[in-house]
Amino acid sequence: MAGCIPEEKTYRRFLELFLGEFRGPCGGGEPEPEPESEPEPEPEAELVAAEAAEASGEDPGEDAATVEAAEEGVQDQDPEPEEEAVEEEAAAEGEEEEEEEEAAAPGHSAVPPPQPQLPPLPPLPRPLSERITREEVEGESLDLCLQQLYKYNCPSFLAAALARATSDEVLQSDLSAHCIPKETDGTEGTVEIETVKLARSVFSKLHEICCNWVKDFPLRRRPQIYYETSIHAIKNMRRKMEDKHVCIPDFNMLFNLEDQEEQAYFAVFDGHGGVDAAIYASVHLHVNLVRQEMFPHDPAEALCRAFRVTDERFVQKAARESLRCGTTGVVTFIRGNMLHVAWVGDSQVMLVRKGQAVELMKPHKPDREDEKQRIEALGGCVVWFGAWRVNGSLSVSRAIGDAEHKPYICGDADSASTVLDGTEDYLILACDGFYDTVNPDEAVKVVSDHLKENNGDSSMVAHKLVASARDAGSSDNITVIVVFLRDMNKAVNVSEESDWTENSFQGGQEDGGDDKENHGECKRPWPQHQCSAPADLGYEGRVDSFTDRTSLSPGPQINVLEDPDYLDLTQIETSKPHSTQFLPPVEMIGPGAPKKAYVNELIMEESSVTPSQPERSGAGELLVSFNLGSTGQQICRMENLSPVYSGLENEQFKSPGKRASRLYHLRHHYSKRQRGFRFNPKFYSFFSAQESSRKIGISLSSLTRSGKRNKMLRSSLPWRENSWEGYSGNMAIRKRNNISCPDLPWDYKI
């Protein structure tokens, strides 16, 4: 076809393949039976005789006379010869049939062999609701078409065009045959439409349109801009998946809008108490958006009204069908160079411009002061029950649905608009399962690292973000949509203003424990409730985790082992630093430990060794202070010392006996929480060493390792039994003789 778009061949090819798999609602899963072939009529006797005469070279006239004479002779004969002739004829026919069967060879048979039955076709999408109103027919028709087409990887432009054409055909047809009249108290109630019958009509129209377009593909203008998107959603630890998302890059084509700039629509809905509200919003909100009068000139206000209309209609549906669920939602609508955002609840969207996170919205949560005042003014309350909740129930202050919580949980959306000047990188739309554990700067870091590692390939960015939220401890459903606003194949550069550095998550801290480098600083304001992940949730097998430094601890099991390389504290010269020998990386296990940790330098100076209290019981004590400066594994061993005791603050010391005198298990505290396993150590100082009676010196070297359930400490010292009084005396002086280690997540006393 002259003047056709370059993709027309691709579209035609898809339609051909699609029709091979999709035969409409009446096709079911079985092929249509083929019509049986009618038997050929037997040739008349005269024609057979004429053909035989031609073959023998005789005159047809003579043959005809012969035939007539034969017939007269037959009539004059007795009946007995007639019966014999019939028997002979039957025998001849039997011989002919046998000859035909013998002549019929494989491949030459007149009757084709039975064809094998084709495999059943995939089932058609089933409507998620049994009944709908007339106002919901358009959204339901579009959704059924798009589901079926996207199942076969239909191009979005073609899918939008087919869905629009099918929906128009359905809306123009007579829907009265699908209606279910409903009467209440003798008065006419709401007229509803049976969705199963509607679905049959939709798929029948879709099949018909596809057949027509294969023969004569209509000219369609192609969109000017396509936004590359990366989408991923997981159920995670929840029993059901209650998130829904919508991605409509061809908004104008889907609604046949010819007088508007290029438009795109993206949304995430996070349901609670059931999935019905999220499904309803994902199917009907964009349809309600287009129907608003102010949509052509004020999309932001149209979005707010669309939320309100969707909420009202779902509340009515919930009353008819006894539904008790709701959903939060965030919608981004792009028209030309304008970005419009509307939301209810705690689902969020963030914009990244020049490598920096830009705040676009503030989620609706009960702890917001304005939301709290609104709820209390209506007679409700906001209480703490694991989280701030409205009337002790829901942890969001606005949502679609939740009819039993109205008016405290309202469906009024907030909106915001911003101009896109071309410096924007991408948008991240996600539910609270993502933003509760990953803050904006961390998300930017994840995307930037992924693009650098994959040469700008953005197809798996959403998977990476979902994995980061899951590893950070999120147990909720997680849905992430990343909409790229520019070509990400170009070099990805983080702006100079950013606090992120390549080695932000390696090495120890040099700022006295302040972890600014690990988290970065957002240059623009952001809601404080989402600024960091829980500190007690660790990443399995990741050194560059985004949680607080405390989650990078070696894990719940620590072993102090022997090592021949140690520092002699008495041999340190003035102002000459010494360090231990570097060890190879040691494999570690535990929910809060990286897979590998490295031994960092252990630097000590002469000034760090000072005499302490006077000798007690013949043993001198040294107070040794130094900075290990590492969160990895350290080595510390004590040799030639007097007996040293280990224990925990506020814990009673228990000796394991002679045979286990070298192995002391330390008791720890554990607690269960909803998002996983949490370990709370209850001790705060590191080492307390006593001077040896043989005056050889004090040598320190300790190695910590992580296990899964317990922590243990072992030393090569000649431990010996001691009385309770001796133990009490040593425990009394323990607090005054210690080596402080502010950078380690746990400190031990020996």
UniProtKB/Swiss-Prot annotation:
GO terms for biological process: cellular response to lipopolysaccharide; cellular response to xenobiotic stimulus; positive regulation of stress fiber assembly; signal transduction. Coiled coil: none annotated. Keywords: Cytoplasm, Hydrolase, Magnesium, Manganese, Metal-binding, Nucleus, Phosphoprotein, Protein phosphatase, Repeat. Residues 46-55 have a biased composition (Low complexity). Its main location: nucleus. CDD domains: PP2Cc. One of its GO terms (molecular function) is metal ion binding. Binds 2 magnesium or manganese ions per subunit. It holds the Pfam family PP2C. Residues 31-44 are annotated as: 7 X 2 AA tandem repeats of P-E. Its cofactor is Mg(2+); Mn(2+). Residues 111-126 have a biased composition (Pro residues). Residues 31-45, 69-103 have a biased composition (Acidic residues). Residues 21-128, 495-535 are annotated as: Disordered. Belongs to the PP2C family. Protein phosphatase that inactivates multifunctional CaM kinases such as CAMK4 and CAMK2. Dephosphorylates and inactivates PAK. May play a role in the inhibition of actin fiber stress breakdown and in morphological changes driven by TNK2/CDC42. Inactivates multifunctional CaM kinases. Dephosphorylates PRKAA2. This is Protein phosphatase 1E. It comes from Rattus norvegicus. The gene is Ppm1e.
